[in-house]
UniProtKB/Swiss-Prot annotation:
Residues 186-196 have a biased composition (Acidic residues). One of its GO terms (cellular component) is cytosol. This is Ribosome maturation factor RimP. It comes from Methylorubrum extorquens (strain PA1). Residues 176-251 are annotated as: Disordered.
Amino acid sequence: MAEPTEKRLVSETGVAARVAQIVEGPIEGLGFRLVRVKISNTNGRTVQIMAERPDGTMGVDECEAVSRAISPILDLEDPVGDAYYLEVSSPGIDRPLVRVSDFERWAGYEAKVELAVPMDGRKRFRGIIGVPSADGTTVPIDLPDVKPGLPSRIDVPLRDLGEAHLVLTDELIRESLRRGSAPPQDGEEGDEEEGAEAEHEAPQVRFIPQPKRPKPKLDKKSDKPVKAKKPKPGGGIVTKAARLKNRDTLH
């Protein structure tokens, strides 16, 4: 069974790496796991933190608990500097795969994998992932429509993993709903008509409090606070999963 302290295979860079370093411990202390930190400039600067329980589930109440725990810590450490929105969310259906246990849990489903180091001159792969090796160093991928003479299955070294995520399919939606790792869509068990239209439309549970503002900076000459830039209007990232956002997002 996956543990909260299982190390991730990937890591952030820059400000996102600093945020991850600050929040990972407190998140684990609540019994959750950090999945990913991403910083974007959509609708004002947004710090998106993905988290989950060790079993892969995450509800809006859990997102709120994580947000309330890490918010004062981020206020104190101030890793971003500028005004920003803090968004805590579940990984979603087409979730990132960041731990060996993620690959184990979702073996048999389609994923996109990108390596930091090329393998046989290639970095990007898409196919059905298998169960990782016993020592957790490689994961097999069955490749569709390969050219004659090329292997249909490869073993990808996880030490070279740059990024990986599940591909949104009707089968994945149904299985995610069955496992409880995705919220139901308007009382239905998956939307087969719209399910596989786009890989980045998978709904997520989100908690977006009021925008965070940086500590006031003092003018060196007058010793008076310098006026901070105001964030752009709008609450967090606007997604195409509008029904879910209206139902599950708290402000």
